[in-house]
């Protein structure tokens, strides 16, 4: 029977990247989704990037992914957040046209031979402990060597409007009704998580004159170096909740399915609903909200920071309690969605199931929240699914390589009891793993893995040769009694001013000039983090034999033995990141390993 090398289940941000990456390796790929017209759709905020997230997108771009291209092509407003802080935490956020983003994502996907199939996957096709493909609700059998599950919030999804609920993966779309049972049958542990989305407001019902305007930056930023034609087109706005907003929420918490105990799923700590904010931060008089256009021609605005599961009739009052929204008309109500997710500790660092070879998963089904986290996982899962189909060994990104490495290491090594969100604070080497140098860090791997052509690496290498040459020139240059590099390290000095006084033989591009300035000004911090990276590599090189009997290791605490037995780390570095494993436990384990255990 003719079949596929890789079948991807789901057409969201994880599924898109999985299919795109798998197809790069030349294997036959099918993407199965209930509604192909909704591929790449943004069910929540119409934006890509932000702190911790733009770094993920930069790494996806460096690895040949499509999210950055689609975001740039659909951009309508861009800003760099944390610009007043250091380069490690500066983060691009790109507001996009929601419909245009999905269209561009679909157009990019069509550049590779991915067969898009309409349908709902009902079950994994497993015989004799071997994965053979998937079966659909309408009775089709799709043979495949590898399967990537990227079902988002659709696995046994339920949406909530107040105390009322109905089965759905998101508003107006049916859930994946049967796939959860198939994953359980394989032996996977499923948990219930929950997320939510704010109301959409009719733009002509908002008094924008009462809102604070946030203009787009000019020139606009971009993830790929190619800003779209509308990237500086529209502003966004800000407003705040009021005492009346908070009173309405407090007086009606009994109508919230979360506070009434109807929702069992755990919600995202770092993206709370407005009722969560009012309860958890009771001392705050108001909360900042962002009013974002949904697109160039849409009649809706998105009320970021106002997600809710309270009843629609109460949402009307809540929204109209906001300055500028006194006459607001809600076009689509806020709601919460509860869904099944896997325990990511049951996965390898290549996002393959430890229980069923050839089964991969990515995105919210792995316990994360956010488009960017989903895209990063999708790329890695799709790459490894294709490699599995070709009989090649699994690859992964070590923690010290960047944000994707940290994301996967946290999920697989530590697990998560709530929807996981990437933040810059999670990354130990964030000064080395900036968004601006993702191309230098990851393009060599992308080329080696077949995700990008060799010519891309040649361009990146040429760029950083020019940067290195300019740093050498500045070291030899004398400026006001010191070297050019020492002069540039002074806070008040800039590379632009230095290059105007002592121009290089060939001008650097803005990206190259930025690299020179960062490497000069932060040289001491960079050297310190490079030493930390070497220490992390040393721990990573300290391998732990498969099947080690941890309870028999002398000096190991009982808690550590239990945690190590559960997580089965492959190195001392992985063991060090498991909660409950102390330094004394690592010392005992290292001594045991040195003795040849």
Swiss-Prot record:
Entry-linked PROSITE patterns: GIDA_1 (PS01280), GIDA_2 (PS01281)
GO molecular function list: flavin adenine dinucleotide binding
SUPFAM superfamilies, alphabetized: FAD/NAD(P)-binding domain (SSF51905)
Requisite cofactors: FAD
Keyword Transport (UniProt): no
Keyword line: Cytoplasm, FAD, Flavoprotein, NAD, tRNA processing
GO biological process, one term: tRNA wobble uridine modification
Major subcellular location class: cytoplasm
Keyword hit for Flavoprotein: yes
Positions contributing to NAD(+) binding: 267-281
Cellular-component GO terms for this entry: cytosol
Binding site for FAD: 10-15
Record's subcellular location: Cytoplasm
Entry-linked InterPro entries: FAD/NAD-bd_sf, GIDA_C_N, MnmG, MnmG-rel, MnmG-rel_CS, MnmG_C, MnmG_C_subdom, MnmG_C_subdom_sf
Annotated family: Belongs to the MnmG family.
Assembly with partners or alone: Homodimer. Heterotetramer of two MnmE and two MnmG subunits.
Cited PANTHER family: GLUCOSE INHIBITED DIVISION PROTEIN A, PROTEIN MTO1 HOMOLOG, MITOCHONDRIAL
Biological function: NAD-binding protein involved in the addition of a carboxymethylaminomethyl (cmnm) group at the wobble position (U34) of certain tRNAs, forming tRNA-cmnm(5)s(2)U34.
Protein name: tRNA uridine 5-carboxymethylaminomethyl modification enzyme MnmG
Gene name of the record: mnmG
């Amino acid at each position: 029977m003719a079949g596929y090398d890789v079948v991807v289940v789901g057409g969201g941000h994880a599924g898109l990247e999985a299919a795109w990456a798998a197809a790069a390796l030349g294997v036959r790929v099918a993407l199965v989704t209930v509604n192909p017209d909704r591929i790449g759709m943004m069910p929540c905020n119409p934006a890509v990037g932000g702190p911790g997230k733009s770094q993920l997108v930069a790494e996806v771009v460096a690895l040949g992914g499509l999210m950055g291209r689609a975001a740039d092509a659909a951009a309508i407003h861009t800003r760099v957040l944390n610009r007043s802080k250091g380069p490690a935490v500066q983060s691009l956020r790109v507001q996009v046209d929601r419909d245009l983003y999905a269209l561009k994502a679909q157009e990019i996907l069509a550049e590779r031979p991915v067969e898009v199939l309409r349908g709902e996957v009902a079950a994994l096709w497993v015989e004799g402990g071997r994965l053979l493909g998937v079966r659909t609700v309408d009775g089709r059998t799709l043979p495949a060597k590898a399967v990537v599950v990227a079902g988002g919030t659709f696995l046994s999804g339920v949406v909530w409007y107040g105390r009322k609920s109905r089965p759905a993966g998101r508003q107006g779309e049916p859930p994946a009704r049967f796939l959860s049972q198939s994953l359980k049958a394989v032996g996977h542990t499923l948990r219930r998580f929950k997320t939510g989305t704010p109301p959409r407001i009719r733009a002509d019902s908002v008094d924008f004159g009462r809102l604070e305007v946030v203009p787009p930056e000019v020139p606009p930023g971009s993830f790929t170096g190619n800003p779209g034609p509308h990237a500086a087109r529209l502003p966004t706005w800000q407003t705040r909740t009021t005492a009346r907003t908070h009173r309405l929420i407090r007086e009606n918490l009994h109508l919230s399915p979360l506070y009434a105990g109807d929702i069992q799923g755990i919600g995202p700590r770092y993206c709370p609903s407005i009722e969560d904010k009012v309860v958890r931060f009771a001392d705050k008089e108001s909360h900042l909200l962002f009013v974002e256009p949904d697109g160039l021609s849409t009649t809706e605005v998105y009320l970021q920071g106002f997600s809710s599961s309270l009843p629609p009739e109460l949402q009307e009052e809540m929204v109209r309690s906001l300055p500028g929204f006194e006459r607001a008309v809600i076009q689509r109500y806020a709601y919460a969605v509860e869904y099944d997710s896997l325990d990511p500790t049951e996965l390898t660092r290549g996002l393959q199931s430890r229980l069923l070879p050839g089964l991969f998963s990515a995105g919210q089904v792995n316990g994360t929240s956010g488009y960017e986290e989903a895209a990063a996982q999708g790329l890695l899962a799709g790459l490894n699914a294709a490699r599995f189909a070709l009989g090649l060994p699994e690859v992964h990104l070590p923690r010290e390589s960047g944000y994707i490495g940290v994301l996967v290491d946290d999920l697989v090594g530590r697990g998560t009891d709530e929807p996981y969100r990437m933040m810059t604070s999670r990354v130990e080497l964030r000064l080395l793993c900036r968004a601006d140098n993702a191309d230098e860090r990851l393009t060599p791997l992308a080329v080696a893995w077949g995700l990008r052509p060799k010519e891309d690496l040649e361009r990146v290498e040429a760029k950083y040769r020019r940067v290195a040459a300019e740093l050498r020139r500045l070291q030899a240059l004398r400026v006001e009694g010191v070297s050019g590099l020492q002069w540039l390290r002074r806070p008040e000095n800039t590379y632009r001013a230095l290059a105007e006084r002592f121009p290089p033989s060939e001008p650097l591009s803005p990206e190259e000039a930025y690299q020179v300035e960062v490497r000069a000004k932060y040289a001491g911090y960079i050297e310190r983090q490079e030493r930390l990276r070497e220490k992390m590599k040393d721990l990573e090189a300290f391998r732990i034999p498969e099947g080690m009997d941890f309870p028999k290791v002398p000096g190991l605490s009982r808690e550590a033995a239990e945690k190590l037995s559960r997580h089965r780390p492959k190195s001392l570095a992985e063991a060090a990141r498991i909660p409950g494993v102390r330094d004394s436990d690592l010392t005992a384990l290292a001594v045991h390993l040195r003795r040849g255990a």
